[in-house]
Amino acid sequence: MFNNLGDRFKDIFKKVSGQGKLTEANMKDALREVRLALLEADVNYGVAKNFVSKIREKALGEEVISGVNPTQQFVKIVHDELVEVLGGTNVQIAKSPKNPTIIMLSGLQGAGKTTFAGKLAKYLRSKGETPLLIGADVYRPAAKKQLKVLAEQVKVSSFTIDESTDVNEICRKGLEEAGKIHATYVIIDTAGRLHIDEQLMGELQGIKDNFKPHEILLVVDGMTGQDAVNVAKTFNEQLDITGVVLTKLDGDTRGGAALSVKEVAGKPIKFISEGEKLDDIAPFHPDRLASRILGMGDVVSLVEKAQEAIDEKEAKKMEEKFRKNQFDFEDFLKQFKMIRKMGSIAGIMKMIPGVDTSA
């Protein structure tokens, strides 16, 4: 994700290096390159234009601070603006003072709602919560079965009514079940469509009106670029969503949706998903992503992944074995398996500052 954009920014920063001051003359070409880089990454035109304008305002005429060269100044300005356009700060998922907290997932068909429901349930379970998955997609034949399988895989409860096509009945009885099992979160997986239509919106509006969800998350396919932004804008206008989830951000995704959705739709990105595994879910932190785009790494996320994947007691045992020269192949294999839990090696490398991952 964002590899091409990151490479473009590196080239731009190299061109700025060696300047004694950030002036209109040496900024003109750099800002033009920034705008082109953003547009090539499928960033919304208006967002790209505003982004460049703000950089120009901050950069032009700034005196070089003692010990900081113009390139470093320019990098900081770009970084700060990236953080802002991505949303500024992390917006956490809602938590109702009275259980359960109800989360409704919405979106078009194929965006990955059902899979994300499983990922979110696993994430919440890892935080000590008790989630219940409700299958309210009554149109896709395999949806309810898929939800049940995912629930079993992540070791949480699920609720569906195979013979019912009444989403309100399913949600009502599902919430009754949530009370019986003392669920702290309820995740409602709704039906998608190939395109936005009145029936889809009417059904979602009905769930919203009848069950008052604390979160209405729109799940969008990050690979669709500008289409994802347009979908987010339309859903927000009709449903007043509380946040966006970007899926499928692995592979060759250009990243335009992530850089545009907050400013265009006016709602924060709350989660991103960069892979197919049920662990591939992360709360969205604008500052961390901005640092990764600019090649600064993301040490905080790296440490968090390590804490989740590495058993502290096991790590202390390994340390003792190292000191006593008793570390063997079986121990090496255990260490390797723990590292594998952190994700792909390529993903880990991207979080380390200064490591070139373009090769």
Please describe what each predicted stretch is.
Residues 2-19, 288-359:
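Long amphipathic alpha-helical segments used for membrane anchoring, targeting, substrate engagement
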Residues 2, 20-28, 41, 45-49, ...:
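Conserved phosphate/pyrophosphate-binding and hydrolysis machinery centered on Walker-type P-loop NTPases
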Residues 9-136, 143-163, 170-190:
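Primarily NTPase-proximal linker/entry elements flanking Walker-type ATP/GTP-binding cores
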Residues 4, 11, 33, 77-84, ...:
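Alpha-helical scaffold segments in soluble metabolic enzymes
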Residues 171-172, 179, 183, 195, ...:
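Conserved phosphate-handling catalytic cores of large alpha/beta enzymes
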